[in-house]
């Protein structure tokens, strides 16, 4: 394992993305989102993914110079065409716009279509939390999960995230599959076995082999209930925003598909929490947080560091394999 300072990791990721053609501001935002995942301990969505993004940038699957193109612009609803750009900076921008408009209109939603993978979805509810708002986020990806009772992958891991301005903030961040696919990839790189019940082979047989799982399918979280929530996420992203469904999204882990745009869609909603109360009180969020603590529990995501306030001196850990891949890319891109 290798240990890096957060500030150094962000600089490295920013430099690599810039060398691959991404403008400085978008590269810096993307790098911070990537490293925030590692800082949260979600290495499967952090620097481990950067070599895959770089490969796709070089092959043409990701447009380094992408710009958000406005499709719909209403007071409480904005939709952008992402122009095949990196999902991180695009979803961060979407969350900031949703937050700004919700503070004026009470609620706002922003969709981004024709985008790419955005990393850990929970990062993008923090622009809302930091403004005292409620945030909800959805995203799609390649089909890896069959419909309930089916034998073909039609749904992505269909992640959903939510942020509530409690003290400390509540951050819900989960895939509706039994496990995020990035964790399967991390297990495959490490040569480790999967937990039983996570995945199936391409023929539908249960497997604990990570490589078989990558070529196969993932189980839904909580059985039919997880499947139902996955359908909801797919509805709010691929079906309604588009331009494509999960079954047609290229696999970022397949080098043979690097040149194919993923055309992923994201959707965020911001709600002004101060406007929701029927009695004018805003104390119940903190009251609940205190009750959870008194009961011996903790709120979901209570230990998550605010991604907009990362400490450059903090440390993250990456595998030796990821460290070697980043060094290889640095040499390849002349850094």
Per-range role (PLM):
Residues 2-5, 22-48, 62-73, 261-263, ...:
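N-terminal glycine-rich anion-binding loops that anchor highly charged ligand groups
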Residues 46-101:
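Active-site cofactor/substrate anionic-group-binding motifs, chiefly glycine-
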Residues 181-242, 259:
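Small-residue-enriched flexible segments
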């Amino acid at each position: 394992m290798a240990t890096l300072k957060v500030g150094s990791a962000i600089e490295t990721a920013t430099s690599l993305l810039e060398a691959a053609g991404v403008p400085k501001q978008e590269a810096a935002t993307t790098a911070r989102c990537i490293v925030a995942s590692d800082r949260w301990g979600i290495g499967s969505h952090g620097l481990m993914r950067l070599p895959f993004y770089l490969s796709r940038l070089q092959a043409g699957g990701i447009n380094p110079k992408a710009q958000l193109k406005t499709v719909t612009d209403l007071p409480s609803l904005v939709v952008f065409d992402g122009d095949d750009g990196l999902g991180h900076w695009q979803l961060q921008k979407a969350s900031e716009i949703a937050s700004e408009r919700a503070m004026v209109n009470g609620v706002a939603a922003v969709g981004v279509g024709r985008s790419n993978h955005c990393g850990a979805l929970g990062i993008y509810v923090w622009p809302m939390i930091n403004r005292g708002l409620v945030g909800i986020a959805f995203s799609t990806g390649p089909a890896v999960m069959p419909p309930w009772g089916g034998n073909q992958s039609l749904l992505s891991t269909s992640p959903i995230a939510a942020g509530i301005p409690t003290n400390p903030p509540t951050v819900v961040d989960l895939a509706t599959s039994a496990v995020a696919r990035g964790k399967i990839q991390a297990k495959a790189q490490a040569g480790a076995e999967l937990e039983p019940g996570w995945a199936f082979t391409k023929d539908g047989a249960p497997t604990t082999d990570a490589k078989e799982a990558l070529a196969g399918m993932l189980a839904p979280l909580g059985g039919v209930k997880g499947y139902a929530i996955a359908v909801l996420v797919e509805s709010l992203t691929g079906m309604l925003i588009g331009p494509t469904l999960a079954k047609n999204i290229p696999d970022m882990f397949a080098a043979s598909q690097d040149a194919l745009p993923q055309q992923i869609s994201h959707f965020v909603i911001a709600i002004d929490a101060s406007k929701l109360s029927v009695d004018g009180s805003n104390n119940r969020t903190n009251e609940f947080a205190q009750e959870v603590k008194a009961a011996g529990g903790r709120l979901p995501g209570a230990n998550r560091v605010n991604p907009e306030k990362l400490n450059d001196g903090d440390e993250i850990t990456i595998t030796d394999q990821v460290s070697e891949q980043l060094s290889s890319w640095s040499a390849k891109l002349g850094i």
